[in-house]
Amino acid sequence: MAACSVELGVITAGGKVTEQLPFTTAMNISQCRHFAASGLTPLGAAMELALDRLEERTAAYRKAGVAYYQPWLVVISDGVPTDQWQAVSARARSLAQQRKMVVMPVGVEEADLEALSAFSTRPAKRLDGLKFREFFLWLSASMSRVSASASTTEQVRLPPTDSWDSI
């Protein structure tokens, strides 16, 4: 059921901001590309694009009269934002406070967790080593629970994160 409900978009910020994958239904994704960290981290510009895309998507659903679940914006970074990110972090946090989206910040290796946390109403979590597989399994299980919930506004109990996060 989640594969029919979940859409995925990927935007990278390795040196420059690139929309790697426009919103695509999960069941239509047959393989995953590998992304390598490189260059500067224009996280502010990447988040601006991500927020714009999410707002465009939810507006299209509203216009078509389609019910949708609160979108999740997963932000994964391995460093420190290298552009002007403070204004867009306030925008993301405001949208999260208004319950228009969930922002899930995740730090890898030497990521600046304080900067990542500024984008969300919840603190950033640090990925334990390189447990990306465990993280994406957790994310998939979480999305399955959300899409199986009875209502688009219902609070959903998510699985524990101990398989992938470090304390």
Question: Could you describe each region identified by the protein language model?
Answer:
Residues M1-L21, S30-Y69, L73-I76, D83, V102-A115, K131-W138:
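Von Willebrand factor
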Residues L21-N28:
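Short, flexible, mixed-charge acidic loops at enzyme active sites
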Residues V10, V103-P105, A124-R126:
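Conserved beta-strand scaffold positions in the cores of enzyme catalytic domains, especially
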Residues M1, R93-M101:
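Arginine/glycine-rich "motif VI" loop of SF2 helicases in the C-terminal RecA-like domain
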